[in-house]
Regions:
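Glycine/tyrosine- and acidic-biased, solvent-exposed loop/turn segments at the edges of beta-strands
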Residues: 15-222
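Sec-dependent N-terminal signal peptides
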Residues: 5-14
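N-terminal secretory signal peptides that target proteins for export/translocation
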Residues: 1-2
Length: 222
């Protein structure tokens, strides 16, 4: 009875895990002839691949060791990382998430060797879309990015407790937003390139209010 159970579990494992069910590639054949099999290939530059093949290309589950020391483990399509995977970079950084044609695209988590972390959307191998970024010193940004820059709606919190929530353009406060100081002072209004600019109201923690037109952080028309 026990043997039957073990055998049944073995069959389930085989048929639910394609890479286990797949036969080994014929080493007597050139890799370009490998199809629906699993095999290993060493390249002249020191790179190494172990995994599934289809129509002479890396396709399916596999592991690729790059010449610079980086290692990718995950899905391949047409010879390149495509789908879900993990890239461990030679410098100590690590990315887990979606790939397309060998680059980061879709959703993923990147942890840099300096301790910074980003979780969110990627496009063309760069941060793009909605996401959350944190830094080792306690800074945090949650919002929209365009080509790695904070751009759109977002909230940034500093280690000292200051907080900005509103519009961003090219990494700077731009448009309508709210800046709250750790001491309790609050500015609500318009910004231009990181400065209070346009209509806005600054309320101090003691109740004092400055309201009017601002120009590059200065109130010019109360």
């Amino acid at each position: 009875m026990i043997k039957k159970i073990i055998f049944s579990l073995f069959l389930i494992l085989i048929y639910t895990n394609p890479i286990l069910a797949m036969s080994d590639c014929e080493k007597t054949k050139h890799f370009k002839e490998w199809n629906d099999c699993k095999g290993e290939m060493n390249l002249a530059n020191g790179e190494f691949y172990s995994g599934e093949w289809k129509n002479g290309q890396r396709h399916g589950q596999g592991k690729f060791n790059y010449s610079d020391g980086s290692v990718y483990t995950g899905q391949f399509k047409g010879g390149k990382p495509y789908g879900k995977g993990q890239m461990k970079y030679a410098d100590g950084g690590e990315y887990n998430g979606d790939f397309k044609f060998g680059i980061r695209e879709g959703s993923g988590v990147m942890i840099w060797n300096h301790g910074g972390k980003y979780q969110g959307e990627w496009l063309n191998d760069v941060v793009h879309g909605k996401g959350i970024a944190t830094w080792p010193d306690g800074r945090k940004y949650e919002g929209e990015y365009v080509e790695q820059k904070k751009h759109g709606k977002g909230t940034f919190v500093w280690p000292d407790g200051d907080k900005y929530s509103g519009n961003w353009v090219n990494n700077k406060f731009h448009g309508f937003g709210t800046y709250t100081h750790a001491q309790g002072h609050i500015y609500v209004g318009n910004f231009l390139a990181g400065k209070k600019h346009g209509k806005g109201t600054y309320t101090y923690v003691d109740g004092k209010v400055e309201k009017g037109i601002w120009e590059y952080d200065k109130l010019i028309n109360p």
